[in-house]
């Protein structure tokens, strides 16, 4: 299991069978704008927020550097993949595109999807040979809100998490206290769960409450939500939209 250890500016590898944690990338120092990468354990990185594994490559949402980075696990190299490092909403080639604190990341086929939180948008990155970035939905750095719709008409507010299930992308619309769903083909976004008011109420999708939901994970039956300010894991049924809170058993 790989972990984005945000405030330590590291990516960690947890070997569950051996109960062992090792560093996969980063030297413990916060990277600065213009970092070019290099040997994984010698390269400073900055606030890795989320990651996704593709064979022996990790794609990392490097929030602190406004870029997407790659970690080659076999060659033990870490380097920028997409984003100029300048905070912006700018589509185009992976070298020219601009991100603003990319946070959530997921992979479907040969496309990365990114919750670009400070820009309040969702991006798609076509992997090689295309190597380009485009915006699917949302506003810009100062164009945020809570509005369903299509493409640039959509308004999100600091989305931090994203997860894919079939032809749907689920979005943790963090500051709107909602879960949204996006169809990448049509670029349509609509509310999926959450009333929009911060709270912890379980129940039907439109009445349930979240409080700054962050990370997402999805199975064939349910969406699991790291409900950050409620210090809880919530479960949303993909068929009914019903929301409940997971009771976690503890052992010593």
Please report, for each region that a protein language model flagged, where it lies by residue.
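Blade-level signature of beta-propeller repeat domains, shared across WD40, Kelch, NHL, RCC1
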Residues: 217, 224-252
């Amino acid at each position: 299991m790989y972990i984005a250890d945000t405030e330590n500016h590291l990516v960690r590898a947890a070997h569950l069978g051996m109960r062992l944690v090792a560093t996969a990338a980063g030297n413990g120092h916060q990277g600065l704008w213009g970092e070019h990468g290099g040997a994984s354990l010698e390269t400073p990185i900055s606030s890795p927020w989320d990651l996704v594994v593709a064979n022996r490559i990790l794609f990392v949402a490097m929030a602190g550097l406004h870029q997407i980075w790659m970690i080659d696990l076999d060659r033990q190299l870490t380097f920028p993949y997409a984003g100029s490092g300048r905070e912006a909403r700018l589509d185009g080639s992976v070298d020219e595109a601009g991100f603003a604190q990319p946070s959530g990341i997921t992979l479907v086929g040969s496309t990365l999807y990114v919750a670009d939180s400070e820009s309040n948008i969702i991006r798609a990155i076509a992997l090689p040979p295309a190597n380009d970035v485009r915006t699917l939905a949302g506003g810009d750095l100062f164009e945020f809100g809570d509005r369903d719709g299509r493409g640039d008409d959509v308004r999100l507010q600091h989305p931090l998490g994203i997860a894919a299930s079939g032809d749907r992308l689920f979005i943790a619309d963090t500051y709107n206290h909602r879960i949204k769903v996006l169809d990448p083909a049509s670029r349509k976004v609509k509310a999926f769960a959450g009333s929009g008011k911060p709270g912890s109420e379980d129940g039907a999708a439109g009445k349930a409450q979240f409080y700054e939901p962050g990370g997402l994970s999805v199975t064939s039956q349910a969406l699991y939500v790291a409900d950050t300010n409620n210090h809880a894991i919530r479960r949303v049924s993909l068929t009914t939209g019903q929301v409940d809170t997971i009771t976690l058993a503890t052992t010593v």
